[in-house]
């Protein structure tokens, strides 16, 4: 498995059978600068969305039309995407699991909101925010937490799914900060690898993952604070 962080909460996940973009906020992502959308979207089979905010939906509509990738989203967000011309959609909701060929995706809880704001400034709710639990054939499992704060039922997610890898938001203000994220990982999960994300993109959120890295010091989890465009082979 090859995992590439594209900045913010966007990732490319490659296995022998699937090529996935997660929360592909690329065009207006300052951390994506210097990378090429055509390169990172080449050959993608699936686009997975944790929730409806613009910094996660990002380029989904254009990429889905260009590549023919299947888009997975919560039911309300899926309906909105359908109204924009996206026609290959797998919809679900919290607690549901969807089989996607060589892997499955389960919608887990997250403490956050999910909406799009129209030109008149009105916020339109698009279902609940979620994490996504990904189980692959013969590969490590991944929990993409999405945007969230810490919550005690993270323990149930770990009990049910035993994720090997965590994509962990650490930027504060809109999600939990690094110290709280470290507490969540140490108290509720047994990740073999944790990759911090959702930081360094906007001036008003934390610019580094240092608080998370410090909070994880001494844990059994291998923390990989990789740079945007950097890849890991796991």
Swiss-Prot record:
It comes from the Bacteria. SUPFAM superfamilies: Metallo-hydrolase/oxidoreductase. InterPro entries: Metallo-B-lactamas, RibonucZ/Hydroxyglut_hydro, UPF0173, UPF0173_UPF0282_UlaG_hydrolase. The keyword Repeat does not apply. Pfam families: Lactamase_B_2. Keywords: Hydrolase. GO terms for molecular function: hydrolase activity. Coiled coil: none annotated. Gene3D superfamilies: Ribonuclease Z/Hydroxyacylglutathione hydrolase-like. Belongs to the UPF0173 family. HAMAP family: UPF0173 (MF_00457). This is UPF0173 metal-dependent hydrolase RL2074. It comes from Rhizobium johnstonii (strain DSM 114642 / LMG 32736 / 3841) (Rhizobium leguminosarum bv. viciae). The lineage of its organism: Bacteria, Pseudomonadati, Pseudomonadota, Alphaproteobacteria, Hyphomicrobiales.
């Amino acid at each position: 498995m090859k995992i590439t962080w594209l900045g913010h909460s966007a990732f490319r996940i490659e296995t022998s059978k699937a090529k996935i973009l997660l929360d592909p906020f690329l065009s207006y992502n300052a951390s994506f600068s210097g990378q090429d959308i055509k390169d990172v979207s080449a050959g993608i089979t699936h686009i997975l969305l944790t929730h409806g905010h613009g910094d996660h939906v990002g380029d989904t509509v254009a990429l889905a039309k260009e590549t023919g990738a299947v888009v997975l989203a919560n039911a309300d967000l899926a309906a909105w995407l359908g109204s924009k011309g996206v026609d290959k959609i797998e919809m679900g909701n919290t607690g549901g699991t969807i089989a996607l060929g060589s892997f499955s995706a389960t919608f887990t809880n997250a403490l956050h909101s999910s909406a799009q704001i129209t030109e008149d400034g009105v916020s339109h709710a698009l279902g609940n925010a979620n994490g996504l639990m990904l189980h692959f054939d013969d590969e490590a499992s991944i929990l993409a937490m999405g945007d969230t704060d810490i919550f005690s039922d993270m323990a149930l997610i770990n009990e049910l799914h035993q994720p090997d890898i965590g994509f962990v938001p650490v930027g504060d203000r809109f999600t939990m900060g690094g110290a709280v994220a470290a507490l969540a990982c140490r108290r509720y999960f047994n990740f073999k690898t944790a990759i911090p994300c959702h930081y360094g993109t906007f001036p008003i959120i934390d610019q580094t993952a240092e608080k998370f890295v410090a909070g994880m010091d001494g844990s059994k989890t291998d923390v990989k604070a990789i740079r945007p465009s950097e890849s890991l082979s796991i």
